[in-house]
Each structure stands twice: as C-alpha cells, then as structure tokens.
A protein has these predicted regions:
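Short structural boundary motif marking the start of a folded domain
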Residues: 1-2, 26
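Short N-terminal binding/cap micro-motifs at the start of the first secondary-structure element
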Residues: 9-14, 36-39
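Glycine-rich beta-strand-centered segment in the early N-terminal region that forms part
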Residues: 19-35, 43-95
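Conserved SAM-binding loop and adjacent beta-strand
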Residues: 71, 103, 123-124
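A structural motif shared across PLP-dependent enzymes of the aminotransferase-like
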Residues: 92-105
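Residue-level recognition of beta-strand termini and adjacent short loop/turns
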Residues: 6-9, 22
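Short loop/helix-cap segments at secondary-structure boundaries that form the rim of catalytic
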Residues: 86, 101-104, 178-182
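Mid-domain Rossmann-like dinucleotide-binding core that forms the NAD(H)/NADP(H) cofactor-binding site
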Residues: 116-183
Length: 183
C-alpha cells in the first residue's frame, strides 16, 4: 500500500502492484517511514508554489503538485531481494510512504546494525543539515547563529559545533525549545 495526497489536505491509502526488480535493483520492505514536519506539511497543505514544483520534486515521487501525488523521502526498510551483499540488511532510502518498493541498489544506504530503524528514519534530516552547510560553509573563527531549534536547526547546530573555532548559537522563538537551544 502507498500513501497518496489526493488533493490539498486529503490523503488516501492506495493499493499498488510491486514491479519486477531488474538487474541491480533491490526490493525493500518498509519498516518505518517518517513525515518531515516542514516540507511534507507544506506539500500536504498544497502550499508548494508552482514556481517550485520542479525543485521540490522528491527522488521517487509519482504524480504532481498539488495532487494527486505520492511524496516522501524518509524510508527505512529491509532488503528482501537484490544483490547478496544487501539482502537482509536494513537500509535508508529517499522513498515515499509505501509498504514495499523496488529501486536501484545504489539508491539505498545500509544502516549500521546499532542504529534502530526509528532513529535511522531521521537520516534525511541530517542530510538536509549537511546540504545547508555545503551551501554556506563556515570558516574557522566564524560566529554562527542558527535560527530555529527544530530537527534541522538542531542538526545544523550540532554539525557546526564540530568545526574548529566556530562559535554556535542556537535560538528559537518558541519558549518550549529554550532548553534544547541552550544545550
């Protein structure tokens, strides 16, 4: 089954036929998928501006904005078919919310054995933080303010804290996040 956004604010579970895997593909059975609070909420509300439809397209998205669209990119599952070195391994993939799927083996990343699927599903959030730092890399001695102590902001602040001689301040207008921001 797959989750589809039928129209802004209205989703549905649809059946699907799992395609036959090709050479070099893997069949993954989903263990966990995550909904990003920012991007996917924007998509669910139908808030993606037409000028951003191409830029916001997810790697294995089906359909188009505002809907119907099968969207998502935080998926952790177990490889059930595919190259021997991947079979039985837990993997992360930028795939929508679906119970099973077929993708090229290169589209999955093996999750370390000591990382539970409930935590591994957050890998996409860390990827967003890494991309932000690639777009605006800090220099030694920089003083950086990260605005927003949500998932992405906390990941950015944590990564910045590992840079030598970079002073990081995490701030948020939400008073309930003050403890996280101060840490």
């Amino acid at each position: 089954q797959a989750f589809w956004l039928r129209s802004p604010g209205r989703g549905e579970i649809r059946p699907f036929a799992l395609p036959e895997p090709g050479r070099g593909d893997v069949v993954v059975r989903t263990l966990r998928s995550g909904v990003s609070r920012g991007t996917e909420t924007l998509v669910f509300r139908g808030g993606v501006p037409p000028s951003q439809h191409a830029a916001m397209r997810a790697p294995f998205q089906e359909g188009d904005f505002p809907g119907p669209v099968k969207y998502g990119y935080l998926n952790v599952g177990v490889v059930e078919q595919g190259p021997l070195e991947l079979r039985g391994h837990t993997v992360f993939c930028l795939y929508p919310h679906q119970t099973a799927y077929v993708v090229p083996a290169g589209a999955v990343n093996v999750v370390p054995d000591d990382v539970p699927p409930t935590r591994a599903v957050l890998a996409g959030t860390v990827e967003t933080a890494v991309n932000a730092l690639w777009d605006a890399p800090p220099l030694v001695g920089d003083r950086v303010a990260v605005v927003g102590a949500g998932m992405v902001g906390c990941c950015v602040a944590r990564l910045l804290a590992r840079f030598p001689a970079v002073e990081v301040t995490l701030v948020d207008v939400d008073a309930s996040r003050a403890g996280v921001a101060a840490a």
